[in-house]
């Protein structure tokens, strides 16, 4: 099925965002693991895998619309400490929420409800990511940065 070029552009834009998130989260997870923040590392790694599933869904839709995926991620923003990582990831997710809101609008305007439904699903996931990241910044503020870090060293699964 031939897709609308404007919708395909949004699908590829979303794919680039997801590829960036996969890589950024994966690097941050490995850094946290290296520093001994195992609980945080496990959660961030799961986020990376979730973003990979998002990318897969986007590629499937792009191929369904007889288009070619753009596999070039955007520039990564790697934090030098946990606080910077959380802030970098929060900015990435806030940008993704804005991008998905625009993509929903464009898909709707171009009568591509299949793509619109996909964008809505991914938007909800990104909003959940924003919520979790905002909770982390709140915990850092309430507990203090050092105490927050002590809550992230658990090796329990």
Where are the model-predicted features located?
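Iron-associated oxidoreductase/ferritin-like identity signal
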Residues: 1-157
């Amino acid at each position: 099925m031939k897709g609308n070029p404007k919708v395909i552009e949004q699908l590829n834009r979303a794919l680039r965002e997801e590829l960036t998130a996969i890589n950024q989260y994966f690097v941050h997870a490995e850094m946290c693991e290296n520093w001994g923040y195992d609980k945080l590392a496990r959660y961030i790694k799961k986020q990376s895998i979730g973003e990979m599933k998002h990318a897969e869904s986007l590629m499937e839709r792009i191929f369904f619309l007889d288009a070619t995926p753009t596999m070039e991620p955007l520039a990564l923003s790697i934090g030098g400490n946990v606080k910077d990582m959380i802030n970098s990831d929060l900015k990435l997710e806030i940008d993704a929420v804005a991008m998905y809101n625009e993509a929903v609008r464009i898909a709707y305007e171009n009568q591509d409800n299949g793509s619109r439904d996909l964008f809505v699903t991914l938007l909800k996931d990104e909003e959940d990511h924003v919520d979790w990241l905002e909770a982390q910044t709140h915990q850092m503020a309430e507990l203090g940065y050092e105490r927050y870090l002590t809550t992230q060293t658990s090796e329990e699964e």
